[in-house]
Amino acid sequence: MPVLVSNLQGKVAVDEALTGLLTRAAQEVLKAEGYGEEAEVSLVFVDDAYIHGLNRQYRGVDAPTDVLSFAMQEGEPLAGGEEELILGDVVISLQAAERQAGEYGHSLQREAAYLAVHGVLHLLGYDHQGEEERKIMRRKEEEVLGRLNLTR
């Protein structure tokens, strides 16, 4: 289950422990949802200005956000080579993660892992527009975070 990590920002320190945790978080979601070793996602770390531009361009929202998911194809993953299943990209503003961690009283690691889990679930088609969808998605997020020992 390859998880490709790119750090396109320099405002929040990124070390191997953080990238390792977020890689495991993404892999835990994929395992929980029945994906095999061929499933691949990318995690891209950016700052608020970068994600603001993406949010404006792709969602028509002129404000920064914490996480955006870009599925390779809406509704279904894109098959890569014979042994690849490329699901898409999860773009995380580490500036937002750091700020929200302070607001919620937990670590950057916990907040960034939550955003990674949330983003990968979006890649897999989960949403939180309605109350029932929100409950399902929240339960799945908490299950994965619990397996990583990252509870509130």
Curated annotation (Swiss-Prot):
Binds 1 zinc ion. One of its GO terms (molecular function) is RNA endonuclease activity. The keyword Ribosomal protein does not apply. Its cofactor is Zn(2+). Zn(2+) binds at H118, H122, H128. It holds the Pfam family YbeY. It comes from the Bacteria. GO terms for biological process: rRNA processing. Keywords: Cytoplasm, Endonuclease, Hydrolase, Metal-binding, Nuclease, Ribosome biogenesis, rRNA processing, Zinc. GO terms for cellular component: cytoplasm. PANTHER family: ENDORIBONUCLEASE YBEY, CHLOROPLASTIC (PTHR46986:SF1). Its main location: cytoplasm. InterPro entries: MetalPrtase_cat_dom_sf_prd, YbeY, YbeY_CS. The keyword Transferase does not apply. It is found in: Cytoplasm. This is Endoribonuclease YbeY. Its EC number is 3.1.-.-. It is an enzyme of class 3 (hydrolase). Belongs to the endoribonuclease YbeY family. Gene3D superfamilies: Metalloproteases ('zincins'), catalytic domain. Single strand-specific metallo-endoribonuclease involved in late-stage 70S ribosome quality control and in maturation of the 3' terminus of the 16S rRNA. The lineage of its organism: Bacteria, Bacillati, Bacillota, Clostridia, Eubacteriales.
